[in-house]
Each structure stands twice: as structure tokens, then as C-alpha cells.
């Protein structure tokens, strides 16, 4: 992805979904396809605020590959790319 002109807020994370490769040449209707649960972190917010008003930094960073909950976040389209904005708490694991 080239330059991002989106400013992600608070503890939100911008994810570019990574589709799994299909094998066997079977074409499924879009309604039958499994929603991706793997993606790349494109941008992160500054973090939420704790009870003292201090920022709590996020664990993930741009460039991390992650697994996330299947129905997490809100899908958006920006510069003809499908992206998902979700809370960091919807991320299940960072792929090392």
C-alpha cells in the first residue's frame, strides 16, 4: 500500500485483510466465502486514555501480520482498497 491519508483514532487499528489462496479451482459465490481473519496492520491510533488521562500505547505496530476475530471491525474502502478498522482488542495474535 502506498501512502495512507487516514488518521486512525484512539485504540483503533487499520488492517488490510489478506485473503487465503484458493486451491482446486472451485469458484464459490461471495456469500459462501469465508471472511478473512488474517491481515496486515497498516496504521494504528495513539492509544486509549487510562483513568489518569495518560495514553495507553498499543501492542501492535504498522507492518505486523495478525489474526483477528472473523466479524471484527468495520469494513471501509479507501483508494479502491478494502480495509477494516477495528479495536486492538479484536486482534487475537501477532504472527511472528
UniProtKB/Swiss-Prot annotation:
Pfam families, A to Z: Cpn10
TM annotation in the entry: none
Q: Principal localization?
A: cytoplasm
Provide this UniProt record's keywords sorted from A to Z: Chaperone, Cytoplasm
Q: Name one GO molecular function term.
A: metal ion binding
Its Gene Ontology biological processes? Answer: chaperone cofactor-dependent protein refolding
The organism's superkingdom is given as: Bacteria
Cellular component, GO, one term: cytoplasm
State the family named in the UniProt similarity comment for this chain: Belongs to the GroES chaperonin family.
Q: What does this protein do?
A: Together with the chaperonin GroEL, plays an essential role in assisting protein folding. The GroEL-GroES system forms a nano-cage that allows encapsulation of the non-native substrate proteins and provides a physical environment optimized to promote and accelerate protein folding. GroES binds to the apical surface of the GroEL ring, thereby capping the opening of the GroEL channel.
Q: Which PANTHER family match?
A: 10 KDA HEAT SHOCK PROTEIN, 20 KDA CHAPERONIN, CHLOROPLASTIC
Can you state the subunit structure given in the record?
Heptamer of 7 subunits arranged in a ring. Interacts with the chaperonin GroEL.
Stated name of the protein: Co-chaperonin GroES
State the organism named in the record: Wolbachia pipientis wMel
Species lineage: Bacteria, Pseudomonadati, Pseudomonadota, Alphaproteobacteria, Rickettsiales
- Record gene name: groES
Amino acid at each position: 500500500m502506498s501512502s495512507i491519508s487516514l488518521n486512525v483514532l484512539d485504540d483503533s487499528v487499520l488492517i488490510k485483510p489478506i485473503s487465503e489462496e484458493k486451491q482446486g479451482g472451485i469458484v464459490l459465490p461471495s456469500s459462501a466465502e469465508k471472511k478473512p481473519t488474517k491481515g496486515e496492520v497498516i496504521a494504528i491510533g495513539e492509544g486509549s486514555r487510562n483513568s489518569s488521562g495518560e495514553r495507553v500505547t498499543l501492542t501492535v505496530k504498522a507492518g505486523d501480520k495478525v489474526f483477528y476475530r472473523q466479524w471484527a471491525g468495520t469494513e471501509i474502502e479507501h483508494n479502491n482498497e478494502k480495509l477494516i478498522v477495528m479495536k486492538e482488542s479484536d486482534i487475537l495474535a501477532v504472527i511472528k
